[in-house]
Amino acid sequence: SLFYSLPWGWWTFTYGYSQSDYRTRNEASGFPFKLDGDSRSHQFRAERVLHRDGVSKTAMSLGLSHQRTNNYVEDTRLEDQSTRITETQLGFNHGRRIGSGFVNLDLGWQQGIGALGAQGRGHPQAGDPHARYDKYSLTLSYLQPFQLWGERFSFDSLATGQRSEDVLFSPQHISLGGNSSVRGFKDQTLTGDSGGYWRNQLRWRRAVEWAPLRP
């Protein structure tokens, strides 16, 4: 993966690239077969700070992303599971310090378009995913550090969700489960076109006292 950020006055320009490959073997009805595939993703974003003071910051952003995925069974490409998606993004962010706590709000609109070699609309049947879609997202978070009995703690709460009236391809789904969303569900996930979750965490930070681990 690659990430580059360029601040320019009130603007910040970012570019990200990631790629992944997989290869595995499976078996069905006693017959083994090979599965493999790859994914490539480009992401460009321009963010403009609209207002900034000692306790808050407000910004808008525009983005463009392109993702290609290829999946194969015995070197035969699975057309219905291989995608070329180009997406435009419009975002709004407001962060504010309240006392010793921090509140952050993110609003987003994502739309699938036909640029950069994206796949066409085709003629999807009912229940088939669309390459031209609209998706709306909202994330609200709160962080509160505090001390108790001489120890350092922090509490953070995050509520996030997305909504789409279209059937989406899996990379555009919201996913529940794993370390990035709901704790305790590492090997179980739930995905969908629309949904959300609310996560609350309490952290306890303590200095390392064992001499061999001290810097």
Predicted feature descriptions by range:
Residues S1-G99:
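Gram-negative/organellar outer-membrane beta-barrel architecture
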Residues Y72-P215:
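C-terminal outer-membrane beta-barrel translocator/porin domains of Gram-negative envelope proteins
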